[in-house]
Structure formats: structure tokens, C-alpha cells
Curated annotation (Swiss-Prot):
<protein>
    <recommendedName>
        <fullName>Gamma-glutamyl phosphate reductase</fullName>
        <ecNumber>1.2.1.41</ecNumber>
    </recommendedName>
</protein>
<dbReference type="InterPro" id="IPR015590">
    <property type="entry name" value="Aldehyde_DH_dom"/>
</dbReference>
<dbReference type="InterPro" id="IPR012134">
    <property type="entry name" value="Glu-5-SA_DH"/>
</dbReference>
<dbReference type="InterPro" id="IPR016162">
    <property type="entry name" value="Ald_DH_N"/>
</dbReference>
<dbReference type="Pfam" id="PF00171">
    <property type="entry name" value="Aldedh"/>
</dbReference>
<dbReference type="GO" id="GO:0050661">
    <property type="term" value="F:NADP binding"/>
</dbReference>
<keyword id="KW-0560">Oxidoreductase</keyword>
<dbReference type="InterPro" id="IPR016161">
    <property type="entry name" value="Ald_DH/histidinol_DH"/>
</dbReference>
<dbReference type="InterPro" id="IPR016163">
    <property type="entry name" value="Ald_DH_C"/>
</dbReference>
<keyword id="KW-0521">NADP</keyword>
<keyword id="KW-0028">Amino-acid biosynthesis</keyword>
<comment type="function">
    <text>Catalyzes the NADPH-dependent reduction of L-glutamate 5-phosphate into L-glutamate 5-semialdehyde and phosphate. The product spontaneously undergoes cyclization to form 1-pyrroline-5-carboxylate.</text>
</comment>
<keyword id="KW-0963">Cytoplasm</keyword>
<dbReference type="GO" id="GO:0005737">
    <property type="term" value="C:cytoplasm"/>
</dbReference>
<comment type="pathway">
    <text>Amino-acid biosynthesis; L-proline biosynthesis; L-glutamate 5-semialdehyde from L-glutamate: step 2/2.</text>
</comment>
<dbReference type="GO" id="GO:0004350">
    <property type="term" value="F:glutamate-5-semialdehyde dehydrogenase activity"/>
</dbReference>
<keyword id="KW-0641">Proline biosynthesis</keyword>
Length: 435
């Protein structure tokens, strides 16, 4: 597969100093034109049989693996620029690719190819008394916009899930990953062409200008849904300004509540895994709640375990956690600690400070566990298990495009079914509706 210079979808050139070129108009046109091309491509994908989509995904996986050198070279340039800008180490880790990570990206596409095709799945069907046969089945959403930060792997994950579910995807990544994303999309587009599929099923929008985001999220009628994936500022801005339907994902102020009926050995294990396994992801625990009835015994043990693991504790022994501590999504080796007076107080605290992502209770009291699971408002609730399990692959349905913290159209880890809508189909033999 011959590849040219990295693909760019507009916005990659700077305008000369002192000339008032209508860049804003041009950028809006570029985004809208890309969306129109995506719409055309989406109609092709919507009619593809599962076998063709799976072959295209396997071809893309082979192309990613076969062009690892190109991808890693582009990523090295991004990393060099990021280091020179003083980017924190945690963000550098999100940005970085190596041979193993590229292999993992390719493996992810092959995994998606092996998943059941959601398109055409019949959710319900029945025959009316007049003989009219009704069925409701899954259909693609159409054109999906993805806005995300930092992680080049999201570029390929979004492509794979969109293709499998029959959708075209418009990608707007972070400027910090521009070269990496260009290289990846270049490879993906070439692989689509090699399978006689439209390259415009995946397009990378310019990350050089923040106005790209505005034009994408306001392209009502051209884009069917936008999924922002990143920090709170990004997600809040998209949800606030969008005219296109959005699915809010990712912000996770997750809690581990240690009930008075907890086995403290289990509590320590669950807490440490929830906090330290990958502290920079949205399902990491950010607050520890300890029941007042066992605080004298449990707090020293749990706080010491956290500190021994390298976690900075905000609250606990020396002082109460502040309001800012309790509302913060740290995404680092930090955690807030507070004492609550029983399960109802824990529920009230979480419903006040949580973000509707993942909450956990540790207890041997099943009545308390049931009250907690019923009362907490979250996409996922864990009983005696780590918050880290909120993940599409861990839940057993494969890759995810994000974790929705809203209640419409999807909630929790979003896999292939969540990238579909539904269509009602009626089969008749001449039925008419009475006056």
C-alpha cells in the first residue's frame, strides 16, 4: 500500500501576516464539506454486510501493524514538541506510542472485527390484530463526530467502532497529537481504498484552530451526534455550545465507600486497585468515604496503605477535605478522604459530589449494599469490587468509544450497540387505517 505525506483535512496552513483572509469562513466550509463527504460515505457503510466490514477492519489492522515505523516516527515528533512545551509526564504517557502500543491498536481492530454486528438486530417484533407485522431493529447513527484529547489510540478505536456499526466518523483530536493522528488516519484511509470503500468514512479535522470544534458541534443536519472525550473543561464546553446532539462522557469523580460492615482487608485491596492501577483514567477512585462507625480503626489503616503506595491524601487525620478536594477529578496519585455517618449519608454525599460515573461500596451487609446500589445515581455501581471494572472490555462486550455519564441516549461504557439508533419496519398486505 503506497502512502503519501500525512493526510490533512484543511486547517493546516497559516495565513500570511497582515492579510485579513476570511479564515473563519473557510474553516467552517471545510468542516461542513467534510461532514457532507462523511454523509455520502455513511450511506455506503450502512448497507455493507458484516463480512465486508470485518474484512475492512482486518485490513486496517494489518495496515497499522505494517506501517508502525511511519506511525512511531510521527509520534516521536509529537513527543519532542510536547516535551519542549513542558507537558506533564502523565500527559506524555497518554500521548506516547511504542511498538507494543501500536500492536495493541492493531489487535483492537481485529477484536472489533470479531464482535457481533449490531446493525439489523431486531429488538422487538410482533403482529398487530390487523395482521400488520412490526419490528424494531438497529440502524447506524450516520455521521459521528469525535472530539478528544491526547491519546492517539482513540483515533483508531473510534474508526473501528464506527465502521463496524456502519457509521462514518469525523475526528478532531488534540493539537499535541497532530502528527500521530495524521499518520494513523493516512493509513486507515488507504486501507479503506484498498477494500473499495470510501476513504471519507474517516476524516481528520484540523486541530490548529479551536474554531474547528465550534463548527463541528454546530453542524446540525450534517452531523448526527458528537462525542467529546477528555477533561471536564472540554466536555462542559461541548455540551454547553453544541447544536448537534451530544453524548457526555468521561468525567469521573468516583468514590469508594467503606461501610461499617466492611472486611477491611477487602476494602484495602479494592481501594488501592481503584486508585493506583491507572490514576489518570476516568474510572479511578478520587474520594474515599469511611463510615464513622469504623473510622477510628479503618482510617489509619486505609490512609497508611494509600500513602505507602505513593498516594497524596487530602483530608483524613490532620484536616477535613475541602470543598475543592471533594469535587476534584485528580487524575493523579491524589485522593480526597471524608468520614460519613452511615450508608444514607454516603449516598447523599455521592449524589452531591459525584459525576454519575462509577461508585463502589465495600461491605458484608447485603441490605446496605442493596440500599447503596438503589440510591446512588451513577452509570455503574460496584459492590466489593474496584471502580476500574467500568470498561467495555471488562464488561464483556469488547471495545468502547467512551463511558457515558448521562442518561440519554446511552449510559455507561459505550460499545457497538450504543453507536446505533433504531428503525421501525412494518410489513403488510394492503392494510389501511380506519377513519
Amino acid at each position: 500500500m503506497g502512502l503519501q505525506a500525512p493526510f490533512r483535512s484543511g486547517g493546516g496552513t497559516s495565513r500570511p501576516q497582515g492579510r485579513a483572509a476570511p479564515r473563519a469562513v473557510d474553516l467552517r466550509r471545510e468542516v461542513h464539506d467534510a461532514a457532507r463527504r462523511a454523509r455520502v460515505a455513511s450511506r455506503v457503510l450502512a448497507l455493507l454486510p458484516a463480512v465486508a466490514k470485518d474484512q475492512a477492519l482486518r485490513s486496517a489492522a494489518d495496515a497499522i501493524a505494517g506501517h508502525a515505523e511511519l506511525i512511531l516516527s510521527a509520534n516521536a515528533e509529537d513527543l519532542e514538541t510536547a516535551r519542549a512545551a513542558g507537558t506533564p509526564s502523565a500527559m506524555l504517557d497518554r500521548l506516547a506510542l511504542d511498538t507494543k502500543r501500536v500492536e495493541g491498536i492493531a489487535a483492537g481492530l481485529r477484536q472489533v472485527a470479531g464482535l457481533p454486528d449490531p446493525v439489523g438486530e431486531v429488538l422487538r417484533g410482533y403482529t398487530l390484530p390487523n395482521g400488520l407485522q412490526l419490528r424494531q431493529q438497529r440502524v447506524p447513527l450516520g455521521v459521528v463526530g469525535m472530539i478528544y484529547e491526547g491519546r492517539p489510540n482513540v483515533t483508531v478505536d473510534a474508526f473501528g467502532l464506527a465502521l463496524k456499526s456502519g457509521n462514518a466518523v469525523l475526528l478532531r483530536g488534540s493539537s499535541s497529537a497532530t502528527r500521530s493522528n495524521q499518520a494513523l488516519v493516512q493509513v486507515l484511509r488507504a486501507s479503506l481504498v484498498s477494500e473499495d470503500l470510501p476513504a471519507d468514512a474517516v476524516q481528520l479535522l484540523s486541530a490548529d484552530d479551536r474554531a474547528t470544534v465550534t463548527h463541528l458541534i454546530q453542524a446540525r443536519g450534517l452531523v448526527d451526534v458528537v462525542i467529546p472525550r477528555g477533561g471536564a473543561n472540554l466536555i462542559n464546553a461541548v455540551v454547553r455550545d453544541a447544536q448537534v446532539p451530544t453524548i457526555e462522557t468521561g468525567v469521573g469523580n468516583c468514590h469508594v465507600y467503606v461501610h461499617e460492615g466492611a472486611d477491611l482487608e477487602v476494602a484495602e485491596r479494592v481501594l488501592l486497585n481503584s486508585k493506583t492501577r491507572r490514576p489518570s483514567v476516568c474510572n479511578a477512585a478520587e474520594t474515599l468515604l469511611v463510615d464513622a462507625a469504623i473510622a477510628e480503626e479503618a482510617l489509619p489503616r486505609l490512609v497508611t496503605a494509600l500513602q505507602d503506595a505513593g498516594v497524596t491524601v487530602h483530608g483524613g487525620f490532620a484536616r477535613d477535605a475541602t470543598e475543592d478536594d471533594l469535587r476534584r477529578e485528580y487524575l493523579s496519585m491524589d485522593i480526597a478522604v471524608a468520614v460519613v455517618d452511615g450508608v444514607d449519608a454516603a449516598i447523599a454525599h455521592i449524589n452531591e459530589y459525584g459525576t454519575g460515573h462509577t461508585e463502589a461500596i465495600v461491605t458484608t451487609n447485603m441490605a446496605a449494599a442493596q440500599r447503596f446500589t438503589d440510591g446512588v445515581d451513577a452509570a455503574a455501581v460496584m459492590v466489593n469490587a474496584s471502580t476500574a471494572f467500568t470498561d467495555g472490555e471488562q464488561f464483556g462486550f469488547g471495545a468502547e468509544i467512551g463511558i457515558s455519564t448521562q442518561k440519554l441516549h446511552a449510559r455507561g461504557p459505550m460499545g457497538l450497540p450504543e453507536l446505533t439508533s433504531t428503525k421501525w419496519i412494518a410489513w403488510g398486505d394492503g392494510q389501511t387505517r380506519p377513519a
